[in-house]
Design a protein with these regions (language model features):
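Structured C-terminal cap/extension of enzyme domains
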Residues: 4, 39, 43-44, 173-187, ...
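Conserved, mostly hydrophobic/aromatic
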Residues: 6, 18, 46, 59, ...
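Alpha-helix-loop-beta-strand connector modules within alpha/beta enzyme cores
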Residues: 57-75, 123-132, 180-182
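Short hydrophobic/aromatic-enriched beta-strand-loop microsegments
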Residues: 70-73, 156-164, 235-241
Length: 281
């Protein structure tokens, strides 16, 4: 398994890391067991968010027994005001049992915050960084134009965006643009919200990019075992796998539900995400 350097952050980890959204669905004892097994197996980058209920708490419980400099924490805030930002950052630090977060990200951004834009939000990031509470400033997005604007701004060190072998050519260009600008690219939804069911194919696809860091959602020990097995024997993007991917693209690519749930709640009470995924059945 090769290493990835996340742009100007200088963070260097294996190209096979942990997305902690799904860990919120697991009871604390089991989640702690999974997280510590991940760490012991070579996973050293863990991505979470203030919005992921008790995910941060579980990470703090599991990882605080290890030297802090031996792993990286990325978290996120959906705050809309400086007051919310500061409160959420302090909560995240407490939950994670740490005095700093390696990458703090604006979560599911609908705008690219900038200095002097009147919101005070980017200034909050700068203040937190100056105070040593965060090390690097990142942004996560689900909209292509927001992601492009974030790269063009030159204000963010990392971009987190949905990316898998079902991604479009436009999303591939996003990866290329991040590389050109030495901006770290964190790939969420590497299994396309569950549409992709062969982890070895998903992993093999990612290995062709030297600037993409996939974070895999894990909630069962047997799932973790699959990802850890790739640390020693990394899947290769063979002609057979390429052909499989092309066939999958023909059947599944295009507009589809990744299962993120950010379309919810619906004011009319409609389960939008469930309806969207039923259309694929």
């Amino acid at each position: 398994m090769k290493d990835i350097i996340l742009g100007t952050t200088g963070i260097q980890v294996r190209q096979n890391e942990f997305g902690a959204l799904t860990i919120q669905r697991v009871e604390i004892p089991e989640s702690v067991k999974i997280l510590r097994k991940a760490y012991d197996g070579g996973i050293k980058f863990f991505d979470t968010a203030r919005a992921y209920s008790d995910s941060e708490v579980k990470l703090g419980e599991a990882l605080s027994i290890y030297p802090r400099e031996s792993y990286y924490l990325a978290s996120k805030t959906m705050a809309k005001t400086p007051e919310e930002f500061k409160a959420q950052l302090e909560t995240s630090l407490t939950n994670l049992k740490t005095d700093y977060i390696d990458i703090f990200q604006f979560h599911c951004a609908n705008q690219v915050f900038k200095p002097n834009d009147g919101t005070g939000m980017y200034e909050c990031m700068l203040e937190a960084k100056a105070a040593g509470k965060i090390r690097h400033i990142g942004i996560t997005a689900h909209k292509l134009q927001i992601a492009m604007d974030a790269i063009d701004s030159g204000l963010y060190e990392t971009l987190q965006f949905p990316f898998s072998y079902l991604s479009s050519d436009k999303e591939l260009k996003l990866v290329e643009k991040c590389k050109e600008n030495n901006m770290g690219f964190i790939a969420m939804k590497g299994l396309a919200g569950g549409l992709i069911n062969k982890s070895e194919v998903a992993m093999a696809y990612m290995t062709q990019f030297d600037n993409v860091l996939p974070i895999w959602g894990v909630q069962k020990e047997k799932e973790l075992d699959e990802w850890l097995s790739y640390m020693e024997t990394t899947p290769v993007l063979s002609d057979e796998i390429k052909a499989y991917i092309e066939n999958e693209k023909k059947e599944l690519a295009g507009d589809f539900c990744r299962g993120c749930g950010y379309c919810m709640p619906c004011p009319a009470g409609i389960m939008i995400n469930q309806c969207a995924r039923m259309s694929l059945m």
